[in-house]
Design a protein with these regions (language model features):
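Central cavity-lining transmembrane alpha-helices of secondary-active solute carriers
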Residues: 48-68, 266-278, 378-381
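Helix-loop-helix hairpin linking two adjacent transmembrane segments in secondary transporters
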Residues: 130, 143-201
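Extracytoplasmic
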Residues: 9-41, 126-130, 242-250
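Extracytoplasmic gate region of multi-pass secondary transporters
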Residues: 28-32, 221-266, 274
């Protein structure tokens, strides 16, 4: 009974960290709207928060795996949280710089540094959370089921982030980084609280193999893992790209109030929440391969419909005027709702891909998790590519980037994920 209680305590902590990752990471998308309007800059430059946050994964991915191998999951989580506290504090400071219009370069530079440091934290925590949930669940379908359960709370935190930021921004054309202070303070408080709780909690951990270059080579020698790492690289372009450019399109091109846009984009993450509930309930019965095959096909269908749906067919959607606390109805193109439904599909992609990619890796699992996290920097690359396409030919046509990513995930599920060899 004692061991069981300890295990559940570890599960609860890992799930709480999963939620924190979503809240802090998703601050970057509404912040991009603020930055674009405050600086009157292009879509490519407006994504500096996402670039900083996700490029950090490239730098920290493998070192994070090494930290786990050397110090264990608990100490590594504490290191990550300490770094996160610093990153959030720097982002907050960027909004406190006087005369932001005259010092725009300084404001954006400080914010970028803060986002980059916060990205270190997100990378480290991801390296801790995913393998620990997989291990605590017993691996296989059961491990995937526990990852999907953690994903439910991850999506809930994302929904809260967008609704909160929609309320804080109000009028996107006049918003400043300092308007996001309450959200940043919430994130800072959560980090501090989590640090204290984890420091006081005993977590039983599996033994880790010493980190050697041969371990990295050993993990990459597994074809299904190498292709899975690329799948995560491209998957990030779907998960973040779809809601990000819905927000930019509705705010910057259609001029829909930020309060309504925040509610709309929150629907995407609410769809992820629903999908993860479903994924958690059937994860022990349905294989990851079947899940990813199904949702990849659905993503292709939904994104293509969203791109080609007539823009003059409108659907009324309720938003909130947070100044007067009244409901405001806004006409939105029907294709936007197809994009939002993609959240149902992305809800199970991360856990499913991770589960397939680390299957049979044995002693290479810890370092493989670090390599996996490194590939999350694909979000920065895919955001840059999609933003460039959006600047060149428009927001809607930029979704061809998402179509390409979804097509690769379908290939990985059907062909690339098959395990050719197993380790003890």
């Amino acid at each position: 009974m004692s061991n069981q209680k300890k295990q559940w305590g570890a599960i609860i902590i890992m799930i709480a960290l999963f939620a924190m990752i979503a809240f802090v990471t998703n601050l970057c998308t509404p912040m991009a709207t603020i930055i674009k309007n405050q600086g009157e800059i292009s879509n490519v430059l407006a994504q500096i928060g996402n670039y900083g946050n996700f490029v950090a994964y490239l730098v920290m991915g493998i070192p994070a795996g090494m930290l786990i191998a050397k110090f264990g999951y608990k100490k590594t989580a504490l290191i990550g949280l300490a770094i996160g506290i610093l990153g959030i504090a720097i982002q907050w400071y960027s909004g406190q710089i006087e005369n932001p219009k005259e010092n725009l370069g300084l404001v954006f530079g400080v914010y970028l540094v803060g986002a980059f440091i916060a990205g270190f934290c997100m990378c480290i925590l991801n390296c801790v959370v995913n393998p620990m949930l997989n291990i605590l669940g017993g691996g296989g379908n059961a491990g995937n089921q526990l990852i999907q359960t953690g994903g439910v709370f991850n999506s809930t935190a994302a929904v809260c982030c967008y609704i909160l930021m929609g309320a804080l921004i109000s009028d996107a054309t006049k918003a400043k980084i300092s308007d996001a202070t309450p959200a940043l303070m919430i994130a800072l408080g959560i980090f501090v609280l989590a640090f204290i709780i984890i420091a006081m909690t005993k977590i039983e951990e599996p033994e880790q193999a010493p980190v050697e270059v041969s371990l990295i080579k050993g993990a990459m020698s597994h074809r299904h893992f190498a292709l899975g790492a690329l799948a995560i690289f491209l998957y990030m372009g779907i998960e973040v790209g779809v809601p990000n450019f819905v927000q930019q399109y509705l705010t910057n091109e259609m001029r829909i109030p930020a309060g309504t846009v925040g509610m709309l984009v929150a629907v995407y993450w609410f769809m992820m929440l629903i999908g993860r509930f479903v994924g958690a309930s059937i994860g022990g019965k349905v294989s990851s391969r079947a899940m990813i095959t199904t949702v990849s096909i659905a993503t292709l269908v939904l994104v293509l419909f969203g791109m080609f749906a007539p823009t003059d067919v409108l659907v009324a959607f309720p938003g909130v005027d947070w100044g007067s606390l009244t409901v405001v109805w806004q006409d939105v193109p029907v294709g936007i709702f197809a994009f939002l439904l993609v959240g149902l599909c992305t809800s199970v992609m991360w856990g499913g891909i991770f589960n397939m990619a680390v299957e049979g890796l044995g002693k290479y699992t810890a370092i493989a998790s670090g390599i996996f996290m490194t590939m999350v920097f694909g979000c920065a690359v895919m955001m840059f590519i999609q933003a460039s396409v959006a600047d060149a030919v428009g927001y809607i046509q930029s979704y061809w980037v998402v179509v390409f990513c979804a097509a690769y995930l379908l290939f990985y599920a059907l062909v690339g994920s098959r395990v050719s060899k197993r380790e003890e």
